Amino acid sequence: MEMLSGAEMVVRSLIDQGVKQVFGYPGGAVLDIYDALHTVGGIDHVLVRHEQAAVHMADGLARATGDVGVVLVTSGPGATNAITGIATAYMDSIPLVILSGQVATSLIGYDAFQECDMVGISRPVVKHSFLVKQTEDIPLVLKKAFWLAASGRPGPVVVDLPKDILNPAKKMPYAWPETVSMRSYNPTTSGHKGQIKRALQTLASAKKPVVYVGGGAISAACYAPLRHIIETFNLPVVSSLMGLGAFPATHRQSLGMLGMHGTYEANMTMHNADVIFAVGVRFDDRTTNNLAKYCPNATVLHIDIDPTSISKTVNADIPVVGDARLVLEQMLELLAQDAPSQPQDDIRDWWQQIESWRARQCLKYDAESESIKPQAVIETLWRLTKGDAYVTSDVGQHQMFAALYYPFDKPRRWINSGGLGTMGFGLPAALGVKMALPKEMVVCVTGDGSIQMNIQELSTALQYELPVLVLNLNNRYLGMVKQWQDMIYSGRHSQSYMQSLPDFVRLAEAYGHVGLQINRPDELESKLSEALEHVRNNRLVFVDVTVDGSEHVYPMQIRGGGMDEMWLSKTERT
C-alpha cells in the first residue's frame, strides 16, 4: 500500500476523484498542500487575487459543466473571505468542495494566529462541514464530501484541514475508497408511483395548465422528458431566473421568465392557471409576490428532490419527492401505458388567452433612442453570438436585462447569482467557465457597480490567458437601487450615484487586456463585433458601454400584489 503524507493524500484524493482544476490562494496553514500540488502534479491550480473570487470561479465551472467545483484556501481570513462565495453556491444549490486550512489540532480553541471556526461559521450555508482530525481519515472524508456535494439537492461542502494532519514528514497508508455511504443521508431519487399517476391525471384534465421550471430542472438534466411532456400536452412554460435554458426560450410554448421582473404573459398565465406543474423550484419570494394573493385557483403539482422545499412557502396539492429526470421518465412510462384524455377545446381557449397577453409585447422599448438602451446592447449581443454564448452576470438591472433579452435555448448557458444576489460574481464566474470550456464564447454582463467588486480578477485572466468578453452596462448608477428609489422613494437617490468612476478602458489596458468604449447606438454592432473577434483571437476584451441611466427594467411587479399586478412602464400598470 502506498505511503503518503496528509498533504499528498489531499492531492491524490482529488486526482482519484477526477478533479482537473482547483481555484485557490495559498497561506501558512495550507502550504504543505501547495507543495504537494507542485510535487505530485496532475491538477491545474488557478491562483486568484481574492478568495471570494476563487469560490465564484469554481461555482462558474460547476454551473457550466455540472461537475463539482473545488476551492483551496488558507485558515482565518482566507476561509472567511470565501464565505460569500459559499453562501452564493448554497442558495443556488451548486456542488462545491471547499478545502480550508486550519491551525494545528492542539491549537484549536486557543485563538492561535489565523484561527477561526470555519466549521461553525460555514454551517448555515453548506450542506455539511467536516473537521478532519486524523491523517488517515482524509481520503474517506473527501470521498464523502464530493458525494454529498453532488447527490440529492447539490450544494457546497467544507472540509477543514488542520495543519498538523498535513505534515509532510508523517506518512500513512493511502487507499481511495471505491464507494461511500452515510447512514443519515439517503436522498430519494425515484418518485412515488401513485403520486406520479395522480399528477399526470391532474395535468391531463387541466383547462388552464402551466409548467413552472426552476434551477432544479437544470441540476437534474431532465430536459428531454420535460420537453416531451410539455409538447405532448401543449403546455405553456414559464421559468424562474435559475431555470432559464431548461426549456428553449425561443420555443413557441415558452413564455419566458416569471416573477418580479418576469414577462407580462408569464405572470398572467401563472395567476390565472388552474394547474401549476412545478419542476425543481423553490417558490421563492421573487417569483410569488404576495403569498396571500398567489395563484388563487391553482392546484399545485410539485416535483423536487428536496422534501424540505415542498410546501415550504406554497402548499403542494400533489407533492412528488425525487430526482426530476427520473420522475419525469416515470411519468412518460405511465403515459405510454395509458395516456389520459385531454380537453382540447379548453387548451385551445387557454392558448388564445395567453396569446392575447403575449400580444401586449411587454418587452418593447424605444429602439430609436439617441442614447444607448441596455436592452439594445443585450439584443445585439444575442444576435452576434447567435444565442450560443455562455453568459454570466452580476446583480442588478443588467442581470434582468440579460435574462429578458438574451433568450437561452440551451441549459447551463445562463450563469448568475439568483438566490443570494451577489455583486462581484460575474467576472470570476466567467473565468471559471472559460477555464472549464476553453473553446466556448464566454461573456460577462456586468454594471459599473458590480464589476468593481472583483475587478482585480482581470489579473488572473491575464496570467492564465482566459479570453472572455466583459460587457459593462455603465449607467453611472447602482441601477436597481436607483429604480427602486425612483418608484418607491419619490426619486430620492440616496447613495446610488457612482461618482469617481475609473476609466474602464484604460484600466483594462493597464491589466494587459483590450479596452473598447461605446457611446452611441450606431457603434454597437461594429464595436461588439470587433470585441468578439478579439476574444476569438485569445484576448480578453472589456467593453464599456455608456447606457441610458434613466432606463428601468419592466415589467416590475407591484409590491404586495398578486402575480397579475405589474408596472409595464413608468406610466402603465395592470
UniProtKB/Swiss-Prot annotation:
EC number(s) recorded for this UniProt protein: 2.2.1.6
GO cellular component, one term: acetolactate synthase complex
Cofactor descriptive note: Binds 1 Mg(2+) ion per subunit. Binds 1 thiamine pyrophosphate per subunit.
Pathway: Amino-acid biosynthesis; L-isoleucine biosynthesis; L-isoleucine from 2-oxobutanoate: step 1/4; Amino-acid biosynthesis; L-valine biosynthesis; L-valine from pyruvate: step 1/4
UniProt region (Thiamine pyrophosphate binding), positions on chain: 397-477
InterPro entries reported in the protein's UniProt record: Acetolactate_synth_lsu (IPR012846), AHAS_TPP (IPR039368), DHS-like_NAD/FAD-binding_dom (IPR029035), THDP-binding (IPR029061), Thiamin_PyroP_enz_cen_dom (IPR012000), Thiamin_PyroP_enz_TPP-bd_dom (IPR012001), TPP-bd_CS (IPR000399), TPP_enz (IPR045229)
Entry cofactors: Mg(2+); thiamine diphosphate
GO molecular function: acetolactate synthase activity; flavin adenine dinucleotide binding; magnesium ion binding; thiamine pyrophosphate binding
Keyword Transmembrane helix: no
Reactions it catalyzes: 2 pyruvate + H(+) = (2S)-2-acetolactate + CO2
Regulation acting on activity, per entry: Sensitive to valine inhibition.
Entry binding sites for Mg(2+): D448, N475
Quaternary data: Dimer of chain H and chain I.
Further information: S.typhimurium contains genes for 3 AHAS isozymes: ilvBN, ilvGM and ilvIH. Contains 1 molecule of FAD per monomer. The role of this cofactor is not clear considering that the reaction does not involve redox chemistry.
Protein family per UniProt: Belongs to the TPP enzyme family.
Record-given protein name: Acetolactate synthase isozyme 3 large subunit
